[in-house]
Amino acid sequence: MAKLIVSDLDLKGKKVLVRVDFNVPIKNGVIGDDNRIVAALPTIKYIIEHGGKAILLSHLGRVKSDADKKELSLRPVAERLSELLKKPVTFVPENEGKEVEETIDKMKDGDVIVLENTRFQDIDNDFGKRESKNDPKLGEYWASLGDVFVNDAFGTAHRSHASNVGIATAMKKAGKPAAAGFLLEKEIKFLGDAVENPVHPFVTILGGAKVSDKIGVIENLIPKSDHILIGGGMAYTFLAAQGHKIGKSLFEADKVELAKELLAKAGDKIVLPVDNVAATEFSNDAPHEVVGDDIPDNEMGLDIGPKTVEKFRDILKDAKTVVWNGPMGAFEMPNYAEGTLEVGRALADLKDAVTIIGGGDSTAAAKQLGIAPKISHISTGGGASLNYLEGKELPGIACVSDK
């Protein structure tokens, strides 16, 4: 079912509540990476260019105490947004109450305000975690501040919070529209097409430490993928399931039987490393060597090896749809980063394919290589994109009105 999009709405003179994802790394008031702020710009600009009054809501980090409040204010985000928009942005140091209401009442068409961190509602109240547990009264209150609601926060789409599901539910109950922003629309389009209607050959690349994090993705994508390439720590659970020696490598002993079942179900679709970069300990400075698919007892696998890279490249060269989630090794250490970087290069070399990257380390690799412009879509949601690839319904998308 097609969702209502911000561009379907008449925004002139309207108070537009926008749930954005401004959950950016901040230390001592300094933003480490403003990508999520930049990703929200198309929706914000569209609203103000069409005469709407943009009222922005976001969480930032996990708020457990008053001390966290000092570190996790959205004030630096509002200042950065003002620089990016090249116009004043008003920051309101509350997200409920008289100051919020008076500031909104004074807004003119095209104005932008940022309310304080929604998760400040998770402490100092009788309900408990009002935001994270979706207190309906909080959702109703926020909904009362606006004429329309736009959800543009894919990063929290897998969570049912007051600031997404709560507002949307109250809006629809009041006969007001709840629409998707352009970022959410883009995520739905790219991930939805990949999961539901991929152009073949469709190759899934999965990495990261744990099989348990990706079980749902593998099960959902076995029937849809032509190949599933597996690297990272999770590969050693699969290699153990095949009877290979894995030395001191990270693996999940309680998931070996499950890995056997997945291998049986997938047939030859699952492709595992044929060689590995192994070291005596988990350290960049440890002696390391390339070994085959059996790892010596005193060593651990920390990256895919050069033959595996070539095998993966050979499969990828014919792909028309590629989804990549998770690193191929201990990417944070230069000596074990090459497998991840090579997979990134292979994706960048594809000319006529839809390429989608999700997950922090895969995204970081794309940025390190400078290949982001060559990738069709880099997802802004870690957990949300995994849930989508599992075929789960995401509350933050389900709550948006259908067209």
Curated annotation (Swiss-Prot):
Reactions catalysed: (2R)-3-phosphoglycerate + ATP = (2R)-3-phospho-glyceroyl phosphate + ADP
MF-aspect GO terms: ADP binding; ATP binding; phosphoglycerate kinase activity
Subcellular location: Cytoplasm
Protein name per the record: Phosphoglycerate kinase
PANTHER family: PHOSPHOGLYCERATE KINASE (PTHR11406), PHOSPHOGLYCERATE KINASE 1, CHLOROPLASTIC-RELATED (PTHR11406:SF23)
UniProt-listed PROSITE patterns: PGLYCERATE_KINASE
Enzyme class: transferase
Source organism: Lactobacillus gasseri (strain ATCC 33323 / DSM 20243 / BCRC 14619 / CIP 102991 / JCM 1131 / KCTC 3163 / NCIMB 11718 / NCTC 13722 / AM63)
